[in-house]
Amino acid sequence: MEPVLTQNRVLTVPNMLSVIRLALIPAFVYVVLSAHANGWGVAILVFSGVSDWADGKIARLLNQSSRLGALLDPAVDRLYMVTVPIVFGLSGIVPWWFVLTLLTRDALLAGTLPLLWSRGLSALPVTYVGKAATFGFMVGFPTILLGQCDPLWSHVLLACGWAFLIWGMYAYLWAFVLYAVQMTMVVRQMPKLKGRAHRPAAQNAGERG
């Protein structure tokens, strides 16, 4: 019975980190768009990126994996992947074609969820290409924002930041192609659930392409 209790826990270190990251999203919007305090924006992005990497490690190390965490962590990740590009677009830091490319990819990905749910799945396994894309964005976005703060190093920071962002974008799109191939195999090989389709258990929600 002990693993069940662990799965149902709410007050865990990883969950608290996810809640903090969630609370920092409106703070990030404010400091960049209203306060024009890009330094604080960089700090929020760095903290969010490091804590996102750390919460999974902590969950395994302290045996604090939970159903809430499996839902909350990827949900917060998606909110960041929507919010940050839009904020950068509104600030004129990145062009809108870049923002729309990322948002269109995520919208297409979200459109496949009903197909997964109808077959008892919540998501497909994350790929190394997807992880590489996430790393590129985690480094690229704060580096470009930091380039807005320091005129002395702006050329170097912007060049490095854009290198990571372009790399991340291509990896992000390639991960979607791999996801589409996986989705095609799932649709062809797995029959729909009989009776009323339902969302699967939350423990698989952390797996995303």
Curated annotation (Swiss-Prot):
Keyword match Transferase: yes
GO BP terms, alphabetized: glycerophospholipid biosynthetic process; phospholipid biosynthetic process
Similarity remark: Belongs to the CDP-alcohol phosphatidyltransferase class-I family.
Protein name (Swiss-Prot/TrEMBL): Putative cardiolipin synthase
GO cellular component terms, A-Z: plasma membrane
Enzyme Commission code: 2.7.8.41
Source organism, top-level taxon: Bacteria
Keyword Lipid biosynthesis: yes
Function statement: May catalyze the biosynthesis of cardiolipin from phosphatidylglycerol (PG) and CDP-diacylglycerol. May also catalyze the synthesis of phosphatidylinositol.
Localization annotation: Cell membrane
Organism: Mycobacterium tuberculosis (strain ATCC 25618 / H37Rv)
Membrane topology label: Multi-pass membrane protein
Catalytic reactions on record: a CDP-1,2-diacyl-sn-glycerol + a 1,2-diacyl-sn-glycero-3-phospho-(1'-sn-glycerol) = a cardiolipin + CMP + H(+); 1,2-dihexadecanoyl-sn-glycero-3-CDP + myo-inositol = 1,2-dihexadecanoyl-sn-glycero-3-phospho-(1D-myo-inositol) + CMP + H(+)
Pfam (any one): CDP-OH_P_transf
Record key words, sorted: Cell membrane, Lipid biosynthesis, Lipid metabolism, Membrane, Phospholipid biosynthesis, Phospholipid metabolism, Transferase, Transmembrane, Transmembrane helix
Pathway: Lipid metabolism; phospholipid metabolism
Sequence intervals crossing the membrane: 27-47, 82-102, 126-146, 157-177
MF-aspect GO terms: cardiolipin synthase (CMP-forming); CDP-diacylglycerol-glycerol-3-phosphate 3-phosphatidyltransferase activity
InterPro entries: CDP-alcohol_PTase-I, CDP-OH_P_trans, CDP-OH_PTrfase_TM_dom, CDP_ALCOHOL_P_TRANSF_CS, Phosphatidylglycerol_P_synth
